[in-house]
């Protein structure tokens, strides 16, 4: 009976975090209590967040929320690139690529490897953002199209 309750609490906890809408531990506590887990408090939620490796990251609405690592789509060598790239935008001189957390350096290295022959002068990568500088005289729209074709392949 106790294990069943613990398992259902863990399942409810993981389900809540997968919604990516909880920005504080107190919000998670309230949601779990509304689901019938009245014995849950902030310290219990804090221990669960640590145990399952939850982190705070930005969701699609740019809000800081808790989520579990498997929701972060941590890249591996079998991940299709299109699953790691969230957005490609540009101005007249620079391309900005938004990726899943942890994927930017992997993708930037790939872009650097195709290099000048494809019109890429260089890249700068953080955790989830890449700045791509095109070579002089290159049509930025053509470069974006080439980059997007590259993302259709896998690593």
UniProtKB/Swiss-Prot annotation:
Pfam family, one: Arg_repressor
One Gene Ontology cellular component: cytoplasm
BP GO annotations: L-arginine biosynthetic process; protein complex oligomerization; regulation of arginine biosynthetic process
Transcription in keyword set: yes
Molecular-function GO terms, alphabetical: arginine binding; DNA binding; DNA-binding transcription factor activity
Methyltransferase listed as a keyword: no
Cited NCBIfam families: argR_whole, PRK05066.1
Function in brief: Regulates arginine biosynthesis genes.
Protein name: Arginine repressor
Species this chain originates from: Histophilus somni (strain 129Pt)
